[in-house]
A protein has these predicted regions:
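Charged DNA-binding/catalytic regions of mobile-element recombinases
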Residues: 1-180
Length: 180
């Protein structure tokens, strides 16, 4: 039950002027204790904040649906971000595309096989794996899942970014909202 690939509306314009204007998403895979764990996050291009995420042992339609629902629930009235992904089957399923359309969100997709079109998401996955996954031996998927959740909380609330003037993503958004 697949829809068509959306056009690349984002066009590598990775700067956003306000929160919830441009979101990007993707899925990454980890291994622990002989099992796999998949992470499906949404990143806000305004401040690099992970606004929603889900993990599961299989990269299913359900994983992406739960992640999307969390993202949609976080939106305030009138917020309709562009949501950019690759052309993975998860993002071409009719139910996913309908959920976006029902909320008035515009879907954008990378060109086929072009990971640079979603560079900010790839960059986040790189930091995540470098800082909490590589060189560590997780005995179980549960232990790894806890570490992923802790890292994302740290990323959002504590990890400073020079591009945000030395603030964390949440601090940067809070400052912006106070000034607004």
């Amino acid at each position: 039950n697949m829809g068509l690939a959306a056009e690349n509306i984002l066009q590598r314009q990775f700067k956003a002027e306000a929160p919830c204007e441009k979101w990007v998403t993707d899925i990454t895979e980890f291994r622990a204790g002989g099992q796999k764990l998949y992470l499906s996050p949404i990143l806000d291009l305004f401040n690099g904040e992970i606004v929603a995420w889900e993990t599961a042992c299989r990269p299913t339609e359900e994983l992406v649906k739960r992640m999307l629902n969390k993202g949609l629930e976080s939106l305030a009235e009138g917020e309709k971000p562009l949501l950019h992904s690759d052309q993975g089957w998860h993002y071409r399923i009719k139910s996913y595309q309908s959920a976006l359309a029902d909320k008035g969100l515009v879907q954008s997709m990378s060109r086929k096989g072009n990971c640079l079109d979603n560079a900010v998401m790839e960059n986040f996955f790189g930091h995540l794996k470098e800082e909490m996954y590589y060189r560590r031996d997780y005995r179980s998927v549960e232990e790894l899942e806890n570490a992923v959740n802790e890292y994302i909380t740290y990323w959002n609330q504590k990890r400073i970014k020079l591009s945000l003037g030395g603030l964390s993503p949440v601090e940067y958004r809070t400052e912006y909202q106070k000034a607004g």
